């Protein structure tokens, strides 16, 4: 019973770290990275669709991306979605493909992005701690119901603390790597 609680908590913490990893890829650095478009949504025949499913995105140069829609009729829709996103990039449309040049980040913009990364990391750590709290409550309930002894519950609580510390450390490392990537000129 207690092992199941620990396993469930660990699975949920893993998904929180994965979500944080995905979330951090949406913060753009000074380099072209197709993952930055993962969160850009465009209307595709009335259905909100990620533009990554509407076009191929390639990186011919370090700070340039080419976006080639699967359907030429959607080029304007994709262009507007990118322009209206919070990425701070401006695509140029040549009728066939969209060219997106990634501007050099200013020092101020870099610091803003670092703050954003830290905020996303903090959100992930809060989610992990909430999972820990939920697990601790379940363990306390097991002890209260008399299904397990105090020593067993305490050992499981200690194990849950170790698991939590491990996942919080993983999030810290993700944020640290993103920060280094952002501050690189």
Swiss-Prot record:
Entry's localization field: Cytoplasm
GO terms assigned for molecular function: ribosomal large subunit binding
GO cellular component entries: cytoplasm
Record flagged with keyword Metal-binding: no
SUPFAM superfamilies per record: Ribosome recycling factor, RRF (SSF55194)
Family matches, as Pfam families: RRF (PF01765)
Main localization, broad class: cytoplasm
Keywords annotated in UniProt: Cytoplasm, Protein biosynthesis
GO biological process per UniProt: translational termination
Function: Responsible for the release of ribosomes from messenger RNA at the termination of protein biosynthesis. May increase the efficiency of translation by recycling ribosomes from one round of translation to another.
Similarity-based family: Belongs to the RRF family.
Protein name stated in the entry: Ribosome-recycling factor
Organism per entry: Corynebacterium urealyticum (strain ATCC 43042 / DSM 7109)
